Amino acid sequence: VPPAQGVEIRVVDLAVADLRDLLADADAVVHLASGVTAGDVGENTGHDRLAVVERLLAAAGDVGVGHLVVRSSAMVYGAWPDNPVPLTEDAPVRPCPDFLFAVHRARLEEMAASWAAGDPARALTVLRPAVTVAEERPGGLASVVGAATSIRSHEGEPLGQFLHSDDLADAAVCAVAARYHGPLNVAPDGWIGVDVMAELGGPGPRLRLPGSLAALVGRVLFRVGLSPAPPGVFPYTVHPWVVSNDRLCELGWRPSHSNEEAYVAGHEPGVLDRLD
């Protein structure tokens, strides 16, 4: 797909490129790179990717970038029994400690906040999107969450939010236009329950197990390669972590896809979806 008129696309490696030269004269920088993926495990995973973020922040500071937009995740709120439904941006950042993806995003937010604090003229927008999908491309996080929710626990019923990538792009544009300073949840209106997700995903029973057994089955399936969902994601399939989009909507943003539409667009049935 050719770029829009006036748009120049340059493919660079942020780990080695001269970022000061690339960012010179930029008014705003939007950093949407994924970093650690939802299926990553291991305590040393992601250090090199955070080093890349450090390079980007240093270069942005050196050349005088005034506005930075970074993509975090709604998962930084963590999935906890006492979470309000929905969560607003005023909720504390407390990711589930065993899920590296969420912990990494929280660390990214800390680094970006330190950059913003270095100069009162700097603005920082932190986008906290729900599970994001594209047409026929569920993405790594959607695949992980989908696999994890196929094993249902008696401890709770998961609530889901699914964001179309086009709506995430519109949110980034909105944040730049408003030069917004602070966190912004990015999600469709409302949320859907596990029964709706099962109906939209097609026929096929799911596993429903006691909490401890569900977690054990999830660990075994991940270890033998039958599931992309690491054990640390399990709390996100039990406790609520859906978010409110009110603050972003106040800036003029509106989702063009519902949860249901985004879920169907990005859903790929997995092994457990077809389990007899």
Where are these regions (language model features)?
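NAD(P)H-binding glycine-rich loop region in Rossmannoid oxidoreductase-like domains
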Residues: 10-55, 59-63
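Conserved Rossmann-fold NAD(P)-dependent oxidoreductase catalytic core, especially the SDR/UDP-sugar
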Residues: 54-100
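Catalytic helix-loop patch of NAD(P)-dependent Rossmann-fold dehydrogenases
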Residues: 81-131
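NAD(P)-dependent short-chain dehydrogenase/reductase
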Residues: 116-161, 165
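Mid/C-terminal beta-alpha module of Rossmann-like enzyme folds, strongest
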Residues: 159, 169-230, 265-267, 273-276
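Conserved C-terminal active-site "lid" loop/helix of NAD(P)H-dependent oxidoreductases
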Residues: 165, 194-196, 223-255
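Amphipathic terminal alpha-helices
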Residues: 249-250, 254-276
